[in-house]
Every structure is written in C-alpha cells, then in structure tokens.
C-alpha cells in the first residue's frame, strides 16, 4: 500500500497545498508588508476597471447562475461516471473545501497594521465554491472530454477569481488561499480513497487467505 503511486501523488498534493496555505497566510495576512502588497494588488487591478470601493458589479448578478450551471455540469459528469465512490469523493471534496474555508475565515486573525479592512477575509468563500467544483471536475471528467471539461472548469474558476479581485470583494491572497484549500481537500480525500482501495484489495480473500498472506 505504501508503494501505491496514486496514494503518494494525492498525499503530496494535500501536504504541499497545506504548507502553501499556511505560508501564504503567514506572509500576506500575518505581516505588514504582505498585507500592503496584497491590498495594493487588489486596488491596482480594480482601478483598471474604475472600481474604487467594493461593489456588486456584474458578478453579483452572475454568481448564482454560474454556480448553478457548475453544479449541474458536475452532476451530469458524476451520473455519466456511474461510480458511487467518485460521487462520495466529490461530495467529500465539496464539503471539506467549503467547511474548511468557512472555519478558517472565522478562526484566523488578521493583525491590525492599518492596511485595508480590518476583518479577515482569508480565504475567499466565494472562490472556494468554484475551486471545489473545479477539483471535482478534475477527478470525474471522462477521458474523451477531459480537455474540454478542464478548460471550462478552470476558465470559469479563473473568471470568478479575477472578478472578486476586480470588484474588491477579496484580495489576491484570499483567492489563492481558496484554491489551496480546495487542492488540500481534494488531495486528502483522494489519499484516503487510495489507501482504502489498497487495503480492500489486500484483505480480499484469495484461496482461503487474504491477499496480504499470499505465498
């Protein structure tokens, strides 16, 4: 089981994402220079579109329709996949991503350095939903449509990520944090799934013995 490449790949994604998330928070939220750079990036990007204060904009109206389309598309992919395990993995990824983002935003502190709004907005709950749907699309897309599905999923996710920055809903650090939460959740779920599958195979009876005792 320990030599399972699928398990190690998923575990590596989970670990790298977790470490990246922690480092990102410590830098862009936990330091004055990090807060300043993060806030200035948001201000400069939004200024290109004439946005000076947080505003609903077009994305405020398009957000829910885009999410509904995203959930419908994922449901179709899961139905076509016809795998109960994939459905369970998808549900776990979405729940862990959204729950993780909500808990982190509620618990993490934003030190007061006089830079931008004092309330913590790391990570972005809005982007976390799009990131979770993208992660699910990655694991359930059929090989024949994989390229098209991934282009659509990452494209919509990128548009949502850019929109919340341009409209001053979130700073770039908040957005990247949401993607890392989704990657960490997906990696953790896939790691558990790979470990469970390997353990099931090892315990499968073969000639009166489990596979672990062959020979």
PLM feature segments, named:
Residues 1-66, 105-114:
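N-terminal transmembrane-helix/juxtamembrane module of multi-pass inner/ER membrane proteins
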Residues 2-6, 76-89, 139-146:
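Membrane-interface helix-boundary motifs at transmembrane edges
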Residues 114-215:
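Membrane-embedded catalytic cores of phosphoryl/pyrophosphoryl-handling enzymes
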Residues 88-120:
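Hydrophobic alpha-helical transmembrane segments of integral membrane proteins
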Residues 14, 18, 90-102, 179, ...:
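Alpha-helical transmembrane spans of integral membrane proteins, capturing the lipid-embedded, hydrophobic core
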Residues 59-82:
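Hydrophobic alpha-helical transmembrane segments
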Residues 74, 82, 95-103, 132, ...:
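Transmembrane alpha-helix boundary/anchor motif
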Residues 8-13, 85-93, 148-152, 174-177:
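Alpha-helical transmembrane segments of integral membrane proteins
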């Amino acid at each position: 089981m320990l030599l399972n490449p699928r398990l190690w790949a998923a575990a590596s994604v989970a670990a790298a994402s977790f470490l990246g998330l922690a480092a990102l928070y410590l830098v862009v939220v936990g330091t004055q220079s990090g807060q300043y750079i993060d806030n200035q990036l948001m201000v400069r990007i939004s200024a290109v579109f004439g946005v000076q204060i947080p505003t609903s904009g077009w994305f405020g109206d398009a957000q829910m329709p885009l999410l509904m389309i995203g959930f419908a598309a994922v449901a179709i992919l899961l139905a076509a996949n016809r795998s109960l395990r994939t459905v369970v993995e998808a549900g776990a990824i979405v729940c862990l991503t959204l729950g993780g983002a909500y808990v982190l935003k509620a618990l993490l502190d934003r030190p007061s350095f006089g830079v931008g709004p004092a309330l913590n907005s790391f990570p972005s709950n809005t982007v976390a939903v799009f990131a979770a749907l993208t992660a699910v699309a990655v694991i359930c897309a059929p090989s024949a449509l994989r390229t098209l599905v991934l282009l659509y999923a990452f494209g919509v996710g990128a548009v949502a990520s850019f929109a919340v920055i341009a409209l001053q809903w979130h700073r770039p650090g908040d957005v990247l944090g949401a993607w890392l939460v989704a990657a960490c959740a997906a990696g953790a779920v896939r790691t558990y799934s790979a470990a469970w599958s390997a353990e099931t195979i090892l315990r499968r009876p073969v000639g009166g013995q489990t596979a672990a005792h062959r020979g």
